């Protein structure tokens, strides 16, 4: 193993120069309770502590309570070592990761809206700059944009998605655009 992780990594992606591996991983993040509870008296036999819920999607059918945390993006040296966390937001950053040919940017799909739970299929393609951890949207469409892939010359991005018309089924299309999000 090139590193020891506390959670399972997914969406592995080698940098074009071969020096780094990017991946996403669930990262737990506990939130403090809004009130402090009294301490347990000596000898008391209490049940487990109450769960503090502050989000709409806190429980899954058959899966119990959702863990606090989100899928975050990491990068680490391909030779091994400690991963460096690149995202730390209240959004899931899972899905395919695509490197720019110069290994300076990673493109990914995510729903980073405040109302993401109410608009689950409204994702965009984002560019993450490794040196600054700056994230900028490349697409801004109504519907899911996913699976970004940068062209070998670094000029274009291919991705899949559709314009959401709120139908029960919509087929995804293949799109190609300039690296800055123009000319879709």
Question: Where are the regions a protein language model picked out?
Answer:
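Short loop/turn segments that connect beta-strands within beta-propeller blades
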Residues: 77-81, 129-133, 178-182
């Amino acid at each position: 193993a090139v590193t020891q992780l506390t959670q399972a990594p997914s969406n592995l992606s080698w940098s074009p120069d071969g020096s780094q591996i990017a991946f996403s991983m669930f990262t737990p993040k506990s939130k403090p309770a809004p009130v402090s509870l009294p301490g347990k008296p000596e000898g008391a036999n209490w049940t487990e502590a109450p769960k503090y819920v502050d989000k709409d999607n806190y429980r899954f059918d058959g899966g119990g309570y959702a863990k606090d945390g989100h899928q975050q993006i990491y990068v680490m040296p391909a030779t091994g070592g400690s991963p460096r966390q690149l995202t730390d937001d209240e959004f899931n950053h899972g899905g395919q990761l695509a490197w720019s040919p110069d290994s300076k940017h990673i493109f990914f799909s995510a729903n980073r809206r405040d109302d993401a739970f109410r608009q689950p299929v409204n994702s965009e393609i984002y560019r993450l700059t490794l040196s600054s951890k700056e994230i900028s949207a490349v697409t801004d469409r109504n519907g899911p944009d996913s699976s970004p892939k940068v062209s070998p010359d670094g000029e274009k991005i291919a991705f899949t998605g559709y314009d959401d018309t709120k139908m029960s089924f919509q087929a995804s299309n293949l799109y190609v655009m300039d690296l800055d999000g123009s000319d879709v």
